[in-house]
């Protein structure tokens, strides 16, 4: 009996020790923002990197990668095995790091460099990797992985080790000397950046010498709003820095150099009076990815926009009357489009000075110039219900706009003024087609629909519409509306052909693997079968809410930026040798 008791006691003791050890070695998730500088322009995090990989590998787009390389899909490790490795730290060190890692990316500065006559934006930033594993264990494999990355990226880089304030830095410098990878390891944290300054900024925060982004009260609010704690990835731009990003982005949109300090100051000063923080999160959705965005607006701006930001109650037949192929199409569904236009101008103008109001009005007006509309207020007052803008090719050189007719006579006067006195006209069915003397623009006007675009596109559209009310095949419509139906309740819905982004993504993956596509024809055909992305935009309580559902989400844009692309594996070279 005594022996049995001792056996029970020893057994309980062993179980208690194992349980205590498991509790002790189990890593606790942390808020990665604690490592990000409070002054960060942009912050991205992924607390479940393996879930991101599983989601991407499970998409229909990734199956094309397997077909392109002729490889069979690789079975992913079982969830219980990943959990065991992550919990205990038992296993190959590479697997332990992957199972335990939390990632964050910070952009600390937006610099500009001149490339001939082109001014390029060159962000400075760093990747933060919390491995939840001791430095002595992670240092060798991390340094080896970074060395391979530098060799893939730069060819024959120069390696250099330096010590600053007692912390070792490792640099791999490209042969031309203008690019570099800088890294340091502090405890379980790995910091990798494209400049020493970016790495040192993050290091200072991790050593508690500088304040962190975690102290920003808007960060947690944005996480809650976008379900960031359950997301594959989460991104945040502090309200204090969103104007700075706009000061770089707006000049590029307007065709001005970001180096124009006076214009940037104008945008920065006034953007803060309109915009707040920005947020993004990504989630799995129907063998694809859903990206959610929140563009915060100041309360006064939201209050001004709300009354007229109402969706049109009726859906007209123009929703199905598209050309036989479009690169992208955007629906604007408002009861009164002209009132919404006026509200946009008034809401922004009421928050800024006179000069900035003029600049904003010019920027807003230019949005419709590419469609041949130079009097937005008059045009929008003469149309009703749904309004469609279409880009027939990726570069936007061929564009169209289609709208329902509210006032046919007003539209006729606008058309005559826009096309000039020497315009030519004829009729196709019940539509009058007018074309300018240079053959650059044409307008088709009937009692129900007005169409603006190039003469060839407008005529082709009008002739097709006269025969059938539905111009696209049902299979094409299903592909376009796969992620979002025409009946979406959003005010603005955009459908976009993602083929080019996916092709670039696949090229980057092939480059990383060091392989080439087996054949271009079948691969391009498979990419063409993927559904269009769909973006729904509404005005919520905090600002503009955008939800994009697509084959790969923003990962198709972000991954090619991280993976160096080798010569011969570009979009035009997805082919066999």
Regions found by a protein language model. Give the residues of each.
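Short, surface-exposed beta-strand/loop micro-motifs that present aromatic residues
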Residues: 105-118, 178-187, 387-392, 438-447, ...
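Structural boundary/hinge residues at secondary-structure and domain interfaces
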Residues: 6-171, 221-275, 290-395, 415-420, ...
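Solvent-exposed coil/turn segments that connect beta secondary-structure elements
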Residues: 47-49, 132-134, 187-189, 195-197, ...
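Extended terminal
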Residues: 4-8, 453-454, 481-577
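Short, Gly/Ser/Thr-enriched beta-strand-loop segments that form substrate-interacting elements
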Residues: 163-178, 429-438
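A conserved glycine-rich beta-strand in the N-terminal activation segment of trypsin-fold
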Residues: 179-251, 437-519
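Short, solvent-exposed coil/turn segments at beta-strand boundaries
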Residues: 133, 184-190, 288, 396, ...
């Amino acid at each position: 009996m005594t022996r049995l008791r001792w056996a029970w006691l020893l057994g309980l003791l062993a179980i208690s020790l194992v349980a205590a050890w498991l509790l002790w070695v189990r890593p606790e998730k942390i808020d990665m923002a604690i490592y990000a500088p409070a002054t960060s322009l942009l912050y991205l995090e992924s607390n479940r990197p393996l879930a991101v990989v599983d989601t991407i590998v499970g998409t229909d787009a990734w199956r094309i990668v397997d077909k392109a390389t002729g490889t069979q899909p690789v079975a992913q490790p079982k969830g219980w095995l990943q959990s065991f490795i992550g919990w205990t730290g038992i296993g190959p060190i590479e697997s332990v790091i992957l199972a335990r890692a939390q990632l964050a990316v910070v952009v600390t500065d937006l610099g500009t460099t001149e490339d001939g006559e082109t001014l390029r934006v060159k962000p400075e930033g760093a990747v933060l990797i919390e491995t939840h594993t001791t430095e002595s264990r992670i240092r060798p494999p991390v340094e080896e992985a970074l060395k391979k990355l530098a060799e893939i990226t730069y060819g024959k880089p120069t390696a250099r080790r330096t010590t600053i304030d007692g912390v070792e830095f490792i640099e791999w410098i490209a042969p031309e000397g203008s690019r570099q990878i800088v890294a340091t390891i502090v405890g379980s944290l790995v910091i990798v950046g494209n400049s020493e300054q970016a790495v040192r900024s993050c290091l200072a925060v991790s050593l508690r010498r500088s304040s962190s982004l975690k102290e920003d009260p808007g960060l947690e609010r944005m996480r809650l709003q976008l379900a960031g704690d359950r997301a594959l990835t989460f991104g945040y731009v502090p309200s204090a820095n969103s104007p700075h990003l706009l000061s770089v982005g707006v000049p590029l949109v307007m065709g001005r150099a970001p180096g124009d300090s006076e214009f940037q100051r104008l945008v920065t000063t006034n953007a803060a009076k309109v915009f707040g923080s920005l947020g993004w999160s990504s989630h799995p959705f129907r063998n694809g990815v859903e990206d959610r965005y929140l563009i915060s607006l100041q309360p006064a701006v939201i209050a001004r926009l709300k009354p007229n930001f109402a969706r049109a109650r009726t859906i007209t037949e123009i929703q199905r009357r598209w050309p036989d192929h479009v690169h992208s199409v955007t629906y604007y569904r408002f009861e009164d489009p002209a009132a919404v236009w006026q509200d946009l101008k008034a809401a922004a103008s009421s928050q800024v000075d006179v000069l900035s109001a003029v600049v904003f009005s010019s920027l807003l007006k230019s949005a419709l110039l590419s469609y041949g509309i130079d009097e937005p207020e008059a045009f929008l007052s003469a149309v009703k219900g749904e309004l469609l803008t279409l880009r027939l090719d990726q570069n936007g050189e061929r564009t169209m706009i289609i709208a329902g007719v509210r006032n046919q006579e007003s539209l006729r006067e606008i058309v005559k003024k826009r096309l000039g006195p020497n315009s030519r006209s004829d009729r196709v069915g019940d539509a009058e087609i007018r074309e300018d003397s240079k053959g650059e623009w044409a307008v088709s006007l009937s009692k129900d629909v007005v169409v603006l675009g190039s003469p060839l596109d407008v005529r082709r559209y009008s002739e097709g519409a006269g025969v059938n009310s539905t111009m696209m095949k049902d299979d094409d419509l299903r592909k376009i509306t796969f992620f979002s139906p025409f009946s979406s309740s959003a005010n603005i819905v955009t459908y976009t052909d993602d083929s080019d982004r996916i092709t670039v993504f696949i090229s980057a993956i092939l480059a990383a693997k060091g392989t080439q596509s087996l054949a271009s024809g079948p691969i391009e055909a498979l990419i063409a079968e993927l559904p269009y992305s769909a973006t729904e935009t509404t005005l919520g309580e905090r600002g503009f809410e955008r939800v994009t559902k697509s084959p790969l989400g923003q990962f198709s844009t972000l991954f090619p930026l991280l993976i160096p692309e080798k010569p011969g594996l570009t979009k035009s070279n997805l082919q066999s040798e």
